[in-house]
Structures are given as structure tokens and as C-alpha cells.
A protein has these predicted regions:
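Short C-terminal tail/terminal secondary-structure segment
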Residues: 3, 161, 250-274
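Conserved glycine-rich cofactor-binding loop
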Residues: 15-17
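Substrate-binding pocket helix/loop in short-chain dehydrogenase/reductase
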Residues: 99-100, 104-112, 219
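Active-site loop immediately N-terminal to the catalytic Tyr-X3-Lys motif
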Residues: 101, 147, 161-167, 189, ...
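Active-site helix of classical SDR
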Residues: 123, 172, 180
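Alpha-helical segment proximal to the catalytic Tyr-Lys
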Residues: 128, 185-189, 247
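Residue(s) in the substrate-gating loop at a strand-loop-helix junction
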Residues: 156
Length: 274
């Protein structure tokens, strides 16, 4: 088990789905976690109950991260509750597939403001707290005998692979990948690691809403490994990147997709649509 004992972590968009899986897995590894959500209050409460049952501290913060000041407020409130911040996991996001001819300015701005702009401004605000944490734990955040703090951005295979109807969503993920590289270079001197996780298809409730049997079969058929991924699998990778084990690993974009971006599955029926 990865050791996150005494780690203080904020996970945005963690009331449900992949974010909830990340938050609960971090808690299993010993971290205290702030769960951010906007609409999924019932699911967020359930996530909090799981974290508390594991013996870890947890606070729920409701906010609309499409608003820049709410990004700042959320990060500050998380750090205040936890008593500092060791890691930020940027996970908040939405996808609304649309053909390019049907995309208007409101649709574009709605997705970009949450999927990318919130990552930027949450990270910007978190840096202040991560530096303070480094000074508290090591006496100097530039102390290279100290493993440092971490920012983990949740991207997607769509940052690398094209898919019909995802021109805006995929563009946000490409932006996240570029931002991760740039911010990593900028923050290395401050002893803050920045990495991204790019999941493929992950088993979450929304994925099976329309037709559980068809979607599961279709999703599994796309993946060379033969199945879709699980939220906790993304969670354990996030835990590794938030842990001291990843000290010498800044600026990486790690795909966790069952081989989707590495191989063409010749058994996939390309006439099917998700």
C-alpha cells in the first residue's frame, strides 16, 4: 500500500465518479482529503462517509469552479480545514459531445471554464499553500532532502486521440497536457511536482446510464486489455504521484487506458457508436 500518512490533499470534482474513486483511494492510503463538488451533494456525502469510516479527516466544499474567485476560495478553504496542503488533484470537468457545426460560444466557454481554466487557477492558488507546507516541513521549500509537494491534473486519452463530437472536450485535455509540462518546469525550483493522468474509459455510473449492457460491451471491446478501467485504478496512480515515491518524477503525462493509446484493437467494430 502506498503511504500517504499525514498527507493533506484537495481533490476537485470528487463527489462522484472518477473523482470519488480518487478521493477514497487517497484516504485508504492514509491521507486526509477535502472533497469538492458542485451538484452531486448526495454522492459527495457518501464519499465523505467512506473517507471518515477509514479513519481520515474529510470536509465537503461546494463551489462552482467555472468562477475564478470560487477556485481561490475552494483552495483556501481546503487548506484552512486541513492545516495546509501537500497535494492538489485537479479533476473537475464535464463533457457534452456535440458536432462542431452545433457548438456555440456558450457551449465552448462552459466546457473550457471548468475543464481547463479551473485547473489553472486552482493550481495557481494551491502553489502558495504548497510552498508554505514545504517551509513548515523542511524549513526551506528548496531543501532537496525533502520530497516536495504535488499537483496532479486529470487529463484524458482524448488529449491524444480524436473522437467525433469531442472537439471542445479534447481541446481542454490537450491544454491540460501542455499546462502540465509548462507548470512542471516552472515549479521544479519550488520543489513542487506537476504530473497528469490520462485515463481511458473508466467504469462510472454515468457511463452506463443509457444502456448498461450495450455500453459495457462496447467499452470493453475498445480496450486491448479487454475491459474498461476502475476509478480506484486511477486513484492508486494519483496516490503514487501524491506520495514521496514520485519525488524524482515531474512533468509526466501518464496514460492509464488498458493499452488503448498503444495499440489498435482490430476486433473493434468501427460502425458502432458509444
Amino acid at each position: 500500500m502506498i503511504n500517504l500518512k499525514d498527507k493533506l490533499i484537495l481533490v476537485t470534482g470528487s463527489g462522484t465518479g472518477v473523482g470519488s474513486g480518487i478521493a477514497t483511494t487517497l484516504a485508504k492510503c492514509g491521507a486526509d482529503v477535502v472533497v469538492h463538488y458542485n451538484n452531486s451533494e448526495r454522492e459527495a456525502e457518501e464519499t465523505k462517509e467512506i473517507i471518515n469510516s477509514l479513519g481520515q479527516k474529510c470536509k465537503l466544499i461546494k463551489s462552482n469552479l467555472k468562477v475564478v474567485n470560487e477556485c481561490r476560495r475552494t483552495v483556501d478553504a481546503a487548506a484552512a480545514f486541513l492545516g495546509g496542503l501537500d497535494a492538489l488533484v485537479n479533476n473537475a470537468g464535464i463533457t457534452i459531445p456535440k458536432d462542431i457545426k452545433d457548438i456555440d460560444e456558450n457551449h465552448f466557454n462552459d466546457i473550457f471554464s471548468l475543464n481547463f481554466r479551473s485547473y489553472f487557477f486552482c493550481a495557481q492558488q494551491a502553489v502558495k499553500h504548497l510552498i508554505k507546507r514545504g517551509e513548515k516541513l523542511s524549513g526551506n521549500y528548496k531543501n532537496y532532502n525533502w520530497p516536495g509537494c504535488s499537483i496532479v491534473n486529470i487529463s484524458s486519452v482524448h488529449g491524444k486521440l480524436g473522437h467525433p463530437g469531442h472537439s471542445v472536450y479534447a481541446s481542454t485535455k490537450g491544454a491540460i497536457n501542455s499546462f502540465t509540462k509548462q507548470l512542471s518546469v516552472e515549479l521544479i525550483p519550488k520543489h513542487i511536482r506537476v504530473n497528469a493522468i490520462a485515463p481511458g474509459t473508466i467504469e462510472v455510473p454515468s457511463y452506463f446510464e443509457k444502456d448498461p449492457s450495450y455500453n459495457r460491451e462496447f467499452g470493453d471491446s475498445l480496450v486491448p486489455w479487454g475491459r474498461v478501467g476502475l476509478p480506484e485504478e486511477v486513484g492508486y496512480l494519483a496516490a503514487y504521484l501524491a506520495s514521496d515515491l514520485s519525488e524524482f518524477m515531474p512533468g509526466e503525462i501518464i496514460h492509464i487506458d488498458g493499452g488503448l493509446t498503444s495499440a489498435m484493437n482490430l476486433n473493434t467494430d468501427t460502425n458502432k457508436t458509444a
